[in-house]
């Protein structure tokens, strides 16, 4: 039943009221709106759904949200900036974003010190009228405060946090969980291999994809595996069977790409392990990631997604996603980690960006069970169907400080740190990556870009919960890392501020010991 909610100071239902500050108290299926001070604000209340519009541009509109509702929302549209303080709020929406920000300027959401606030969404079916996220922002978004903010998205197509522009996070304890499925799969489109500047194989109808094999005037339009003739599918299955028979066991005599763990291509097949599984590196099957076939999904349930840049300055951020295509943190224009503790676990890329990813001082644990742990897809790089074909020598990943643990447990060709042949720069910090990788081919620094001595451990056997320790020449322990899964023949990129050129070091773990000398800024250790 529709009810008009009376504010303590003003009565508002589709009429213009005067206020600068607004308090909204949710109570079950009702919401009570209290206004104070004067400004041009229009408030509409329908049950526990509150819509606020303000034409005031010069003042930052201040809102306080408190109480609890299992079927409520806030829709906010102001011409100026706004600040929303969450003060012990528990708000669930049964359809669409419980916090829907239509602002044309930045909105700050503050978790009040000492409070626990939980925002949830259970369905995102009406994508025309409601945006598919717990927090959906049209403009820049700042998440801050000394309290806790829990973001829970259980509905199909529902993301955790989605912004069309930049997202900044600082101080807050932020926990993001998504568990719904995506809304379908897009046909796979192949954009061509990087190469000729005068054309190639662009995407159909897209003249911006100019790389690829030079001279090719045409293009390769998107295709769907279901459209492939049955006889061709049978040929694929026969190829799979022959590979499995030929490559059963060790494949060290088979060659393959230089530096691949195991020296060659491992068997095709289901390569998506659960926690604790032990696998050997290899190509995934034709339906999975890697060379076998990339997937693009409609409304994949990502944790934090921005079409702009994501910057994390401080705070404690935990992100958990669980379904195909659901990347943990995605910033189309880059991601910057300046500080804080960040823990991301995803079946897809844990951290993904369409531009440079910078690590300047945070403690970051990025873990993927089915793809790369950290994946930067800048302009240029390797296999441009997944990026752009404009060649660009700007760094894809820069590590200046902090701790970066990037762990992919799926096997080759997925990596801990993946930048597709674009430059990877290491200037400082502690790094330990885990992944099947592609050896020395794409995602390692050079002697020029390794400002801090760095090694690539090729073929280290990662065993679940077994400590990996690094010692200097005097047997002094430098660092210890424990991985929560097993992976045979990992290609692990490792650096530490204690590493010095000319120094000798030893890596030890159960069943593995390797001593090496840092004769160059970047050293591959087999």
What are these regions (language model features)?
Residues 1-4, 8:
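Positively charged n-region of N-terminal signal peptides that target proteins for export
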Residues 8-9, 246:
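A periodicity- and composition-biased signal for non-globular, repetitive helical segments
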Residues 10-18:
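Hydrophobic h-region of N-terminal signal peptides that target proteins for export
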Residues 19-526:
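A composition-driven surface/loop motif
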């Amino acid at each position: 039943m529709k009810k008009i909610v009376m504010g303590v100071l003003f009565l508002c239902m589709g009429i213009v009221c005067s206020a600068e500050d607004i308090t909204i108290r949710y109570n079950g299926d009702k919401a009570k709106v209290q206004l104070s001070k004067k400004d041009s604000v229009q408030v509409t209340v329908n049950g526990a759904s509150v819509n606020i519009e303000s034409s005031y541009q010069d003042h930052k509109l201040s809102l306080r949200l408190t109480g609890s509702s299992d079927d409520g929302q806030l829709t906010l549209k102001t011409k100026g900036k706004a600040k929303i303080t969450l003060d012990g709020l528990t708000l669930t929406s049964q359809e669409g974003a419980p916090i829907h920000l239509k602002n044309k300027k930045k909105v700050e959401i503050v978790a009040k010190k000492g409070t626990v606030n939980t925002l949830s969404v259970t369905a995102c079916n009406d994508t025309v009228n409601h945006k598919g996220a717990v927090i959906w922002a049209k403009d820049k978004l700042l998440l801050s405060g000394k309290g806790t903010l829990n973001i829970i998205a259980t509905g199909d197509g529902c993301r955790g946090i989605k912004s069309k522009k930049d997202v900044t996070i600082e101080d807050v304890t932020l926990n993001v969980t998504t568990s719904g499925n995506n809304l379908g799969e897009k046909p796979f489109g192949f954009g061509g291999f990087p190469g000729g500047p005068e054309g190639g194989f662009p995407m159909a109808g897209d003249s911006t994809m100019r790389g690829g094999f030079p001279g090719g005037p045409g293009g390769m339009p998107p295709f769907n595996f279901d459209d492939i003739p049955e006889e061709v599918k049978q040929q694929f299955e026969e190829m799979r069977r022959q590979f499995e028979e030929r490559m059963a066991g060790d494949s060290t005599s088979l060659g393959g790409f230089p530096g691949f763990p195991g020296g060659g291509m491992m068997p095709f097949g289901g390569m998506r392990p659960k926690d604790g599984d032990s696998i050997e590196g290899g190509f995934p099957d034709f339906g999975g990631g890697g060379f076998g076939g990339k997937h693009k999904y409609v409304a994949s349930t990502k944790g934090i997604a921005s079409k702009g840049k994501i910057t994390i300055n401080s705070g404690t951020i935990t992100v958990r996603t669980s379904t195909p295509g659901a990347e943990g943190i995605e910033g189309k224009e880059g991601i910057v980690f300046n500080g804080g503790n960040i823990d991301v676990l995803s079946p897809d890329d844990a951290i993904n960006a369409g531009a440079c990813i910078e690590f300047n001082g945070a403690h970051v644990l990025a873990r993927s069970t089915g793809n790369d742990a950290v994946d930067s897809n800048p302009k240029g790089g390797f296999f441009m169907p997944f990026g752009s074909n404009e060649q660009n020598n700007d760094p894809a990943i820069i590590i200046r400080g902090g701790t970066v643990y990037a762990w992919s447990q799926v096997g080759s060709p997925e990596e801990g740190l993946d930048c597709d042949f674009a430059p990877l720069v290491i200037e400082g910090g502690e790094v330990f990556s885990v992944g099947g990788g592609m050896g020395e081919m794409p995602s390692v620094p050079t002697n020029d870009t390794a400002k801090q001595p760095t090694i690539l451990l090729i073929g280290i056997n990662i065993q679940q919960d077994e400590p990996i320790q690094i010692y200097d020449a005097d047997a002094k322990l430098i660092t210890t890392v424990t991985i929560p899964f097993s992976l045979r023949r990992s290609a692990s990129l490792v650096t530490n501020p204690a590493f010095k050129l000319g120094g000798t070091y030893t890596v030890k773990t159960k069943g593995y010991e390797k001593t090496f000398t840092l004769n160059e800024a970047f050293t591959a250790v087999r």
